[in-house]
């Protein structure tokens, strides 16, 4: 069995909103997976954020890259293996079959609206 290439680290983010503090909790904290496997990452909001949820990927020394916006829409140039679901309080980012370049940090972000 091939050893996992790397770990996916997730962050816990607190983001203010006009209605008060919204806490986004990502799980699991880490995933140990190999290329070709399926990755499922969860983000739970302490109150409904409708569909205003985005997923980002970040690699060392690079700026965050937008993957998914409005819960389920892929950003320009993002491969179809990335998909998102929502809305409400429970969101999921799925990578259907991991490629070596997918091993990175992933995090979710809530915004009250998009500008």
Curated annotation (Swiss-Prot):
Region feature (Framework-3): 77-108
InterPro entries attached to this UniProt entry: Ig-like_dom (IPR007110), Ig-like_dom_sf (IPR036179), Ig-like_fold (IPR013783), Ig_sub (IPR003599), Ig_V-set (IPR013106), IgV_Light_Chain (IPR050150)
Places the protein is found: Secreted; Cell membrane
Residue intervals of the Ig-like domain: 21-115
GO BP field: adaptive immune response; immune response
PROSITE patterns: IG_LIKE
Disulfide bonds: 43-108
Pfam families according to UniProt: V-set (PF07686)
Framework-1: annotated span: 21-43
Keywords per UniProt: Adaptive immunity, Cell membrane, Disulfide bond, Immunity, Immunoglobulin, Immunoglobulin domain, Membrane, Secreted, Signal
Region (Complementarity-determining-2): 70-76
Residues annotated as signal peptide: 1-20
Keyword Metal-binding in annotation: no
Region feature (Complementarity-determining-3): 109-115
UniProt-annotated stretches for the region Complementarity-determining-1: 44-54
Framework-2 as annotated region, ranges: 55-69
Principal localisation: secreted
GO cellular component terms, semicolon-separated: extracellular region; immunoglobulin complex; plasma membrane
Purpose of the protein: V region of the variable domain of immunoglobulin light chains that participates in the antigen recognition. Immunoglobulins, also known as antibodies, are membrane-bound or secreted glycoproteins produced by B lymphocytes. In the recognition phase of humoral immunity, the membrane-bound immunoglobulins serve as receptors which, upon binding of a specific antigen, trigger the clonal expansion and differentiation of B lymphocytes into immunoglobulins-secreting plasma cells.
Assembly and binders: Immunoglobulins are composed of two identical heavy chains and two identical light chains; disulfide-linked.
Protein name, as recorded: Immunoglobulin kappa variable 3D-11
Species annotation: Homo sapiens (Human)
